């Protein structure tokens, strides 16, 4: 079981106490907040990228792949509803290095997407998830 306690800090600000730290949540001044924290929907995209990124990093280590830089760019499109939800999410895995093994890196991404990342499985229940990979030789 996971447990997170989220406490109101006044106005539109909250703090979530997680097992490994605290996350501040707020909205921008244009929405009545102070802009002093993360926005909830952006945190969802960050959780998705972080979950899959941990899988891919672990697999890169196990496969002994040489990667100089690795980042994940995640974009989500929201519905127009009052309670807007993501209906489409694109995740772009970007690898840079001198000796990139593209097939093995794509395998690591696919294993995360199809087998290991629980956050990915949650997103797939409510959004179309598109996966892209990019490789940059340096």
Write out the residue ranges for each language-model feature.
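Extended beta-strand/beta-hairpin segments
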Residues: 1-46, 57-138
């Amino acid at each position: 079981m996971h447990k997170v306690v989220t406490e109101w800090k006044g106005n539109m600000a909250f703090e979530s106490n997680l097992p490994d730290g605290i996350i501040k949540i707020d909205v921008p001044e244009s929405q009545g907040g102070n802009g002093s924290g993360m926005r909830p929907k952006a945190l969802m995209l960050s959780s998705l990228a972080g979950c899959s990124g941990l899988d891919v990093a672990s697999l890169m280590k196990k496969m002994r792949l040489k990667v100089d830089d690795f980042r994940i760019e995640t974009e989500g499109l929201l519905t127009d509803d009052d309670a807007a939800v993501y209906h489409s999410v694109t995740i772009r895995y970007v690898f840079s290095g001198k000796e990139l093994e593209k097939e093995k890196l794509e395998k690591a991404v696919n294993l995360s997407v199809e087998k290991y990342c629980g956050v990915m499985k949650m997103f797939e229940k409510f959004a179309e998830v598109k996966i892209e990979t990019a490789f940059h030789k340096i």
